[in-house]
């Protein structure tokens, strides 16, 4: 029974990877909307775009690592 619960927990933790993809889409979509409204300010916001994408991807990687730990270490 304990092994099955670890697999269920890993599956639930893997949902965070999908949530990271949604977060990256939101960040990129909002950047694109702002760049289309004000093209002259788009170049100065590129660094902020990459920082936002990096934070969203980091959360997805952490969720993936938790899923792997639940699958193989517990």
Swiss-Prot record:
Q: Which InterPro entries match?
A: ATP_synth_F0_csu (IPR000454), ATP_synth_F0_csu_sf (IPR038662), ATPase_proteolipid_c-like_dom (IPR002379), F/V-ATP_Csub_sf (IPR035921)
Q: Does the keyword Acetylation apply?
A: no
What keywords sit in the KW lines? ATP synthesis, Cell inner membrane, Cell membrane, CF(0), Hydrogen ion transport, Ion transport, Lipid-binding, Membrane, Transmembrane, Transmembrane helix, Transport
Annotated localization: Cell inner membrane
Spell out where the chain crosses the membrane.
5-25, 49-69
One GO cellular component term of this record is:
plasma membrane
Provide a Gene Ontology MF annotation, just one.
lipid binding
Residues the UniProt record annotates as site (Reversibly protonated during proton transport): 57
Q: How does it sit in the membrane?
A: Multi-pass membrane protein
Give the family this protein belongs to, as stated in its UniProt record.
Belongs to the ATPase C chain family.
Extract the HAMAP family matched here: ATP_synth_c_bact
Q: How does it assemble?
A: F-type ATPases have 2 components, F(1) - the catalytic core - and F(0) - the membrane proton channel. F(1) has five subunits: alpha(3), beta(3), gamma(1), delta(1), epsilon(1). F(0) has four main subunits: a(1), b(1), b'(1) and c(10-14). The alpha and beta chains form an alternating ring which encloses part of the gamma chain. F(1) is attached to F(0) by a central stalk formed by the gamma and epsilon chains, while a peripheral stalk is formed by the delta, b and b' chains.
As for what it does, the entry says: F(1)F(0) ATP synthase produces ATP from ADP in the presence of a proton or sodium gradient. F-type ATPases consist of two structural domains, F(1) containing the extramembraneous catalytic core and F(0) containing the membrane proton channel, linked together by a central stalk and a peripheral stalk. During catalysis, ATP synthesis in the catalytic domain of F(1) is coupled via a rotary mechanism of the central stalk subunits to proton translocation.
This protein is called ATP synthase subunit c
Which organism is the protein's source? Answer: Roseobacter denitrificans (strain ATCC 33942 / OCh 114)
Which gene codes for it?
atpE
């Amino acid at each position: 029974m304990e092994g099955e619960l670890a697999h269920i927990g890993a599956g639930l933790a893997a949902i965070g990877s999908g949530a990271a993809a949604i977060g990256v889409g939101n960040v990129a979509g909002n950047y694109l909307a702002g760049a289309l409204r004000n093209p002259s300010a788009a170049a100065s916001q590129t660094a902020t775009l990459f920082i936002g994408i990096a934070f969203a991807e980091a959360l997805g990687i952490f969720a993936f690592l938790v899923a792997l730990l639940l699958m193989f270490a517990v």
